[in-house]
């Protein structure tokens, strides 16, 4: 069985709405039909497993009831037979998720959990590299992978990007990425950008033995064009790509993963429209399962004290979600903490994510805007993580670590990174 948990908000009966979801999303329609036999329903009809009442509300998520109407709320578990859906993710999205938002009689519905049976394990490839592969390719063990982003996000020409990358790879950083907004614009075609950047990365590897992982933006609405972008990166010796998962969709991701030799770094831009209203959409816990099955290797999930709307608690639950095996540990992608990060968030990130160092800690301005330059910025972030793991307050550790001290002086007001 495939089990979904729906958080229902309705001025009517929760039980009635639960039954309606189970019926409408499986065998039922607005009137009984001759073909809806008991035998058919026994095979493919969804059924309500449990209803857990929640506190009533007075403010509707959707404006379909007058303000101050009493609204009943509950978490409802509904099970769908595997025979009714199969293991196709587009079928799962359509049957168990897509149609529920249009059902009449609710003022809000949010999907808060999804449990998939073992059949999904073998039906989808999952991550090709994940945590272990990302560590192997960056050569980083015993600490978080430290990354940065090319800034400004847009406008740099290939030779200008390469100049900045040359400075960054000399800083000791482990990972660099194109901003998610940069793909292949006329002023910086991907082919030219790759040709400008990769020789610097390979030359640095030849001299030092360290190959910095660079994630190029290869997303495209045409899967064939996206695959050609992939091949440009791979042929030049690259090993990572930024993929805007909501823009390319399930089909694009599936097409890419089956043919990919690159680490696939998932950026979820656009995700907010699916989750920002707490009474509608879905939890990240549900959303991320689709993309992990499809094969993302690294998953960007914001961080602590970010520059966007998402609260810290949401990041913590997202981190837990991607770090929890669907079926086994190999299907966990590398969590990527980013957005306004510098070393100052390292202690809280470490403590609130289960004291793990298995993450990519992504700092844009927190590295490139350091008063001592990018190399000092990288050292400051590394020092912050050393302090976090050792349980030493940053201010104490900074007394003997000038790069961290300078970082605290610049960024501790929360406005600089």
UniProtKB/Swiss-Prot annotation:
The lineage of its organism: Bacteria, Pseudomonadati, Pseudomonadota, Alphaproteobacteria, Hyphomicrobiales. The modification N6-carboxylysine is found at residue 177. Its cofactor is Mg(2+). Keywords: Carbohydrate metabolism, Decarboxylase, Lyase, Magnesium, Metal-binding, Plasmid. CDD domains: RLP_NonPhot. It comes from Rhizobium etli (strain ATCC 51251 / DSM 11541 / JCM 21823 / NBRC 15573 / CFN 42). SUPFAM superfamilies: RuBisCo, C-terminal domain, RuBisCO, large subunit, small (N-terminal) domain. GO terms for biological process: carbon fixation. Involved in catabolism of D-apiose. Catalyzes the decarboxylation of 3-oxo-isoapionate 4-phosphate to L-erythrulose 1-phosphate. The keyword Magnesium applies. Belongs to the RuBisCO large chain family. Pathway: Carbohydrate metabolism. Its EC number is 4.1.1.121. It holds the Pfam family RuBisCO_large. Mg(2+) binds at residues 177, 179-180. InterPro entries: OiaX, RuBisCO, RuBisCo_large_chain_AS, RuBisCO_lsu_C, RuBisCO_lsu_C_sf, RuBisCO_lsu_fd_N, RuBisCO_lsu_N_sf. It catalyses: 3-oxoisoapionate 4-phosphate + H(+) = L-erythrulose 1-phosphate + CO2. GO terms for molecular function: magnesium ion binding; ribulose-bisphosphate carboxylase activity. The keyword Lyase applies. This is 3-oxo-isoapionate-4-phosphate decarboxylase.
């Amino acid at each position: 069985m495939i089990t979904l948990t729906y958080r229902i908000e309705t001025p009517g009966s929760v039980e009635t709405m639960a039954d309606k979801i189970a019926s409408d999303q499986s065998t039922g329609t607005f009137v009984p039909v001759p073909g809806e036999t008991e035998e058919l329903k026994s095979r493919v009809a969804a059924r309500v497993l449990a209803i857990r009442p929640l506190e009533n509300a007075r403010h509707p998520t959707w404006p379909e009831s007058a303000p101050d109407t009493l609204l009943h709320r509950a978490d409802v578990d509904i099970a769908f037979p595997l025979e009714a859906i199969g293991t196709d993710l587009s079928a799962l999205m359509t049957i168990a998720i897509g149609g529920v938002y249009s059902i009449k009689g609710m003022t809000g519905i949010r999907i808060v959990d999804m449990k998939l049976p073992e059949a999904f394990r073998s039906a989808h490839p999952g991550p090709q590299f994940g945590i272990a592969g990302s560590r192997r390719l960056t050569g980083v063990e015993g600490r978080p992978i430290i990354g940065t982003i090319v800034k400004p996000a847009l406008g740099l020409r290939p030779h200008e990007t390469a100049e900045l990358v040359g400075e960054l790879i000399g800083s000791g950083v482990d990972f660099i990425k194109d901003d998610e907004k940069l793909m292949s614009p006329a002023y910086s075609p991907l082919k030219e950008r790759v040709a400008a950047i990769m020789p610097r990365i390979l030359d640095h590897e030849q001299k030092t033995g360290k190959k910095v992982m660079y994630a190029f933006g290869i997303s495209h609405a045409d899967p064939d064009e996206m695959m050609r972008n992939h091949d440009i990166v791979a042929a030049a010796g690259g090993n990572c790509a930024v993929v805007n998962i909501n823009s390319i969709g399930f089909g694009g991701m599936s097409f890419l993963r089956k043919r990919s030799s690159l680490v696939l770094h998932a950026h979820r831009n656009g995700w907010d429209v699916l989750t920002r209203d707490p009474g509608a959409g879905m939890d990240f816990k549900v959303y991320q399962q689709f993309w992990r099955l499809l094969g993302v290797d690294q998953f960007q999930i914001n961080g602590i004290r970010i520059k966007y709307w998402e609260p810290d608690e949401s990041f913590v639950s997202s981190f837990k979600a991607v770090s929890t095996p669907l079926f086994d540990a190999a299907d966990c992608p590398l969590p990527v903490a980013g957005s306004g990060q510098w070393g100052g968030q390292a202690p809280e990130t470490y403590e609130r994510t289960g004291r793990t160092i298995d993450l990519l800690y992504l700092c844009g301005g927190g590295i490139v805007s350091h008063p001592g330059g990018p190399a000092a910025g990288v050292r400051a972030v590394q020092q912050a993580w050393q302090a976090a793991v050792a349980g030493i307050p940053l201010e104490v550790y900074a007394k003997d670590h000038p790069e961290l001290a300078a970082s605290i002086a610049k960024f501790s007001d929360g406005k600089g990174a």
